Amino acid sequence: MEGGGGRDEPSACRAGDVNMDDPKKEDILLLADEKFDFDLSLSSSSANEDDEVFFGPFGHKERCIAASLELNNPVPEQPPLPTSESPFAWSPLAGEKFVEVYKEAHLLALHIESSSRNQAAQAAKPEDPRSQGVERFIQESKLKINLFEKEKEMKKSPTSLKRETYYLSDSPLLGPPVGEPRLLASSPALPSSGAQARLTRAPGPPHSAHALPRESCTAHAASQAATQRKPGTKLLLPRAASVRGRSIPGAAEKPKKEIPASPSRTKIPAEKESHRDVLPDKPAPGAVNVPAAGSHLGQGKRAIPVPNKLGLKKTLLKAPGSTSNLARKSSSGPVWSGASSACTSPAVGKAKSSEFASIPANSSRPLSNISKSGRMGPAMLRPALPAGPVGASSWQAKRVDVSELAAEQLTAPPSASPTQPQTPEGGGQWLNSSCAWSESSQLNKTRSIRRRDSCLNSKTKVMPTPTNQFKIPKFSIGDSPDSSTPKLSRAQRPQSCTSVGRVTVHSTPVRRSSGPAPQSLLSAWRVSALPTPASRRCSGLPPMTPKTMPRAVGSPLCVPARRRSSEPRKNSAMRTEPTRESNRKTDSRLVDVSPDRGSPPSRVPQALNFSPEESDSTFSKSTATEVAREEAKPGGDAAPSEALLVDIKLEPLAVTPDAASQPLIDLPLIDFCDTPEAHVAVGSESRPLIDLMTNTPDMNKNVAKPSPVVGQLIDLSSPLIQLSPEADKENVDSPLLKF
């Protein structure tokens, strides 16, 4: 059998082994061993066993055999294998076959040895690096894991946690406590100056409540003047206010003594005069204490705290930047220090009052400073009047309007009037009265009364005032009594642009405050403190620049515009029709003023009618006649003066009488701009501002030539007006129009 022949090979090899050398014997043995080993895996019957075994791919068994051959272990294994195989029948090999088998055996043995050695070396090498690499990898991973664990331990460590917590807790906790003491320190400082008068109000629960808002106002002023106290004071204002209201009486005993006087002032003007004399002396030391840190800051706080209600409303309506600018400008260190010193010493106050009077004529900013003190005490207006007759007279006219409203509301103007002359006579008393105003709501009522007196006194002066623009504020006088305090607050923003408007608005809220003394007084106080300086500056400026004057005129008109509501708007539209040029030039200004008030159009036409820029001579004449009538009218009821003013303005608009009658009710702010179309027909209101501009030359014969320039101005202001073409209220509410 083949198998037998195959098995004869080892026998032949053995026979040859006897003749062969030892190495050959080893080779033969190796072959035999391998053959037998492979017989285990392969069938013994296959004749090509050797070929199959050795030429096939090397498996795990072959590698193991190669390793054993290298170790010379196959020698002992060989005898058992042949012994085990001995029972099989072996056929003898022929000589040729034996030689062939021998050669093949050697070749196979060499091949197997070489391959086995290479494989063994390769297997040994990769095993070592693999094991080493695995170990290294494990070590590295352990190190990395240890690092992570260490980091976790560091994070979890109580020290690290404590550090983090302390840092977080320290930054916020330390900040607020520091701010609180600052607020506390600031709160005593404030009550020492302006809160003393507030304490005088504190005896009554409503007065204490008002004192708190006033303190908030003072905090606003302090924040504007000094950024250090801004956040703390704003956040802690309610607490500080409550604490101040409680602790201030203990802190300032003098104001407590004044407390009984404060209600009496609010009730009786004569008592107010006596209290004014008393208050200036006490607030003066408070003011002196505050100026030590910053005279203008302390007194600025005084001025701010008085009008809480109106001041808050003003802050809402007016841009914070504008209010801050007003407060900063109005509360100039030197001027307020002078006021405080004047409070301390009436003689010095007199000298300084004369200085203030001279200042308004010279520059607008001193007027603004005076305006603060003047609002504090209308007497300032009177001393300022001789120094600057034009600005002072216009400003007085504004206050005259306010005073007329106050006279209508309050019956005590005569009693207040003597106090006013007394204050101007003694500059110190006047400054003291201003300080008292900043300190107490009583001063607010007195302010309204003084404004009435100043109105009575300044009415005569206003009548001679040549500038129609300043006379226009009388319109606002008529309107202000009817208009509600919120309307005044609305008008106050545009009045910021126009000093006269602001003055009238501030005065009107004071009169209204006479009804609800505490709230209105607080609001009036803030109003007088912040906006007045800007308005007085404007009053000083208008004579120098007529353009600013129409703005000032427009703002007072804005107050009556509210009262007139739709009717004044229509009237104003009729008036503005003939004067498109001036109207559009001032449209941007009017738009600025209008957003604050529901009926800005009436203000706009008035300001335009009185503005020197008007191209129509008829308008200037009509405005002069209207101003004269208005001067005569303000003595009477303010409302009739408004109606007359509207009628007078309609007369200059006689160029288009048909439209005048129709749009009185229908014309909104856009209609106001559309007044030329209104002349054509009431249905033309729907036309856009641009269409109106194009139509204006046709409608307004007098304005036809400058109409292109007016068109440009309207184009700039048209988008703001177009926001709410149908209703003026919408324009007022629109954010773009608001300042």
From Swiss-Prot:
Cysteine disulfide links: none
List the molecular function annotations (GO) for this entry. Answer: microtubule binding
List where in the cell it is found: Cytoplasm, Cytoskeleton
Q: Note down the stretches annotated as region Disordered.
A: 1-20, 116-136, 149-306, 320-639
Matching entries from InterPro entries are given as: DDA3/GTSE-1, GTSE1_N
**Locations of Basic and acidic residues compositional bias?**
1-11, 149-165, 268-280, 577-590
Please provide the record's keywords in A-Z order: Cytoplasm, Cytoskeleton, Microtubule, Phosphoprotein
Phosphoserine: residues bearing it: 91, 157, 171, 187, 208, 247, 262, 331, 480, 496, 499, 514, 520, 523, 528, 535, 555, 594, 611, 707, 717-718, 724, 734
Gene Ontology BP annotations: DNA damage response, signal transduction by p53 class mediator; microtubule-based process
User: What's the main place this protein lives?
Assistant: cytoplasm
Membrane-spanning residues: none
Instruction: Output the CDD domains linked to this UniProt entry.
Output: GTSE1_CTD
Q: Which residues form a coiled coil?
A: none
Biased composition of type Polar residues is found at: 360-372, 430-446, 455-470, 481-522
Q: How is it modified after translation?
A: Phosphorylated in mitosis.
> Which Gene Ontology cellular component terms are annotated?
cytoplasmic microtubule; cytosol; membrane; microtubule cytoskeleton; nucleoplasm
- Residues that the record marks as modified (Phosphothreonine) are 159, 485, 532, 696
Give start-end positions of Low complexity composition bias: 181-195, 284-294, 330-342, 411-424
State what this protein does: May be involved in p53-induced cell cycle arrest in G2/M phase by interfering with microtubule rearrangements that are required to enter mitosis. Overexpression delays G2/M phase progression.
Its recorded name reads G2 and S phase-expressed protein 1
Q: What is the lineage of its organism?
A: Eukaryota, Metazoa, Chordata, Craniata, Vertebrata
Q: Which gene encodes it?
A: GTSE1
